[in-house]
UniProtKB/Swiss-Prot annotation:
It comes from Byssochlamys spectabilis (Paecilomyces variotii). It is an enzyme of class 1 (oxidoreductase). The keyword Cell cycle does not apply. The lineage of its organism: Eukaryota, Fungi, Dikarya, Ascomycota, Pezizomycotina. GO terms for molecular function: copper ion binding; oxidoreductase activity; polyketide synthase activity. This is Multicopper oxidase VdtB. Residues 26-139, 168-368, 466-585 form the Plastocyanin-like domain.
Length: 685
């Protein structure tokens, strides 16, 4: 190959990115992330799922093999899925469920760069452990906002290195009861339950039982005001009150809650997460992921201030903070200066005070730190002598700076269009019970809706035209989504909702108290200009409603990625109990779905199909009609097309037959006992 062609090929690869393949094997087995054993989901034998790291622009191919007893899918949270909507991972929208014993191929471009994560999107199985971090490194030479933190060239270089080699901290909650049992507890008790056993840091934690009276003494003023005649349980769980249960509180049956879920604390000791930093690096990036299913968490690192420089995978103008509230689905990347005395410092992550008094503890460990800088373990096993910002109850112990979540302007500046083309007003809230929800205000979105007839494949179906659950948009248009909570006099105060849209980031251009009584966003802007920000509005993929009574939020985005996408609350039980809608973006430019997805091959291309099906795919490539045409003249053309057509019809049927047989073989393998399966897997590997 001439040298210039080789150079050109290398440049093309740099632009397009490498082809990267990964395999995720899902199993249902015993685990004890907080010291208490239960059945759970493991990925490649571990929990949390493996951290996936790609370079910006990589061509990613991930084979997911389901060896569990239930079907599943995986969503790649925050990835735009431009031109690959069949890989978004939502059953009933972008794919059919991956049944037990089956496999599925996800293909997408690693873009945009930044901190993301992946998790199950089938029923409420996020509670069972299927989630992991996904990080996309920026291209070399990409500018960052480092000079807004420090103008020192050495600091800038150190921060750039740290941003591409972060310490990832997955924050999640965990309970002994699995997702099915938890949902049954909600339904049987007719109550919205928020209680868990543990907060986990990178899948590690313990069950803390500091004592009922100790917890009662730690109650802060708003708690006494919220339940003057009641108290928290020995697990720190809040009592059921009208602000969370609505007018159906009296219908609740606390006795139907399983033992140990709401009260009855039993301590268990599990592992403690520690991240090691080298002060010679000057700076470190700690990337926090809100992988919780219920909890709103408040992370801090003793004696270390944070510079938040990226939110939901997008650079912002850095903001200094000692702590912030991180909700389900959110991500915050924080730069910390490594200039403290070399020793251990506690990482403390309490619940932010919304549903339970509970916390997790980890360690920021300086390399070559002082081994004597320790104390006797306290009631939580903490041995550090560092000074905390907040107590176990999330109450400040000294002056601390909270992050203002409405003051997170994207960097460089990025603003939406001045006017929207369409407006959709959604009335979020309960659906005639404490534990069922609606996003549209009209209907619940069933968790298995159109599961086996994905709307991506059936954009003109009857289910794709249900105005109560479906929004249809035109490509290139600007859409305004108005989220209204507290609109019903039956429940004027509603618990916050973390609303996430697939395939898009969007701007929060406005928000205000009261009821939305406007025919357009422009009318509202004219009436309440102080409630809108069109200069530097926050830009991310997850936004919140507020716990302040009736209020509204206006979100704006442009339709640039046609496909079937989900809009939903990221609290797992809210989603599984109905708080979602489908947005069919760009119905006028609907994507063509490749045959390997529409024809039941689960993303496997002809030559990739297992067993004999793969053989027939290879043979078909050799004997397809166009190959015969190349070998003959004009007289052969008609004959080759005729023979080739018959051959393609026959081999397609055979290929499908062998694929079905291969999947049945996978199910047979799945049904073997656990030890035999592991032995078989060892042989295959």
């Amino acid at each position: 190959m001439p040298a210039y062609l080789l150079l050109l090929a290398c440049n093309v690869l740099l632009v397009l990115g490498a082809h990267v393949q990964r395999e995720l094997v899902l199993t249902w087995e015993e685990g004890a992330p907080n010291g208490q054993s239960r059945q759970m989901i493991k990925t490649n034998g571990q929990f949390p799922s493996p951290t996936l790291i790609f370079d910006e622009g990589d061509d990613v191919e991930i084979v997911v093999r389901n060896y569990m007893h239930e079907n599943t899918t995986i969503h790649w949270h925050g990835i735009l899925m431009q031109d690959t909507p069949w890989s978004d991972g939502v059953p009933g929208l972008s794919q059919k469920p991956i049944e037990p014993g089956e496999s599925y191929v996800y293909r997408f471009t690693a873009y945009p760069p930044g901190q993301y994560w992946y998790h199950s999107h089938s029923r409420a199985t996020l509670l069972d452990g299927l989630y992991g971090a996904l990080f996309i490194r920026r291209k070399p030479g990409t500018a960052g906002p480092w000079a807004m933190i420090s103008e020192d060239p050495e600091d800038i270089a150190a921060m750039e290195r740290a941003s591409n080699n972060p310490h990832i901290m997955m924050l999640s909650d965990w309970d002994y009861y699995n997702s099915t049992q938890y949902k049954e507890a909600d339904a049987n008790s007719r109550l919205q339950i928020f209680c868990v056993d543990s907060i986990l840091l990178n899948g590690k934690g313990s069950v803390y039982c500091p004592g009922h009276q100790w917890l009662i003494d730690k109650q802060i003023p708003f708690m006494h005001k919220s339940w003057p005649n009641d108290t928290i349980t020995d697990k720190g769980c809040f009592p059921f009150v009208p602000s969370t249960e609505g007018p159906w509180l009296a219908d609740g049956n606390v006795s139907a809650i399983p033992p140990g879920l709401q009260e009855g604390c039993v301590p268990y000791s599990g592992p403690t997460e520690a991240i090691e930093v080298d002060p010679a690096d000057r700076w470190a990036s700690v990337n926090w992921i809100g992988g919780s299913t219920f909890k709103t968490l408040q992370p801090t690192i003793d004696e270390h201030e944070m510079w938040i420089y990226e939110v939901d995978g997008h650079y912002i103008e850095p903001r200094r903070a000692d702590t912030f509230l991180i909700w389900a689905g959110e991500r915050y990347s924080a730069m910390i200066r490594l200039d403290k005395k070399p020793m251990d410092y506690s990482i403390r992550v309490p619940d932010g005070g919304y549903s339970q008094m509970i916390a997790a503890f980890g360690i920021l460990r300086y390399k070559n730190g002082d081994p004597n800088a320790r104390q006797k373990p306290d009631r939580f096993g903490v041995t550090t002598i560092s000074k905390p910002y907040f107590d176990y109850n999330a109450w400040p112990m000294r002056d601390a700076v909270f992050l203002d979540k409405l003051d997170l302007p994207p960097w460089p500046r990025k603003v939406p269009a001045a006017h929207g083309d369409d407006m959709h007003v959604l009335y979020l809230g309960k659906a005639n019970s404490t534990w069922e929800f609606t996003l549209s205000g009209k209907k619940k979105y069933p968790p298995d809706r159109s599961a086996y007839e994905p709307l991506l494949y059936n954009v003109n179906s009857e289910q794709a035209h249900d105005d109560d659950l479906i929004i249809r948009t035109q490509n290139g248009t600007w859409q305004d989504i108005v989220l209204q909570v507290g609109h019903s006099p039956l429940w004027p105060v509603d618990f916050p909702h973390a609303v996430h849209k697939h395939a898009n980031k969007y701007w929060r251009i406005g928000g205000g108290q009261g009821l939305w009584n406007y025919s357009s966003v422009e009318e509202a802007m004219a009436d309440q200009p102080e409630s809108f920000n069109m200069v530097n509005p926050p830009y991310r993929d997850t936004f919140l409603t507020e716990f302040t009574g009736a209020m509204w939020v206006v979100l704006r985005y442009q339709v640039t990625s046609p496909g079937a996408w989900l809009l939903h609350c990221h609290f797992e039980m809210h989603l599984d109990n109905g708080m979602a809608m489908a947005i069919l973006d760009g119905v006028d430019k609907w994507p063509h779905v490749p045959p390997e997805y529409t024809q039941g091959f689960h993303g496997f291309r002809e030559h990739e199909l297992p067993g004999p099906a793969g053989f027939w795919g290879l043979v078909s490539k050799i004997l397809r009609p166009e190959s015969l045409v190349w070998a003959g003249g004009a007289a052969v053309v008609l004959l080759s097309l005729f023979i080739g057509g018959l051959w393609r019809l026959w081999q397609r049927r055979m290929q499908g037959t062998y694929y079905v047989l291969s999947q049945e073989d996978e199910r047979d393998r799945f049904s073997m006992d656990k030890e035999a399966w592991k032995s078989e897997e060892t042989k295959r590997m």
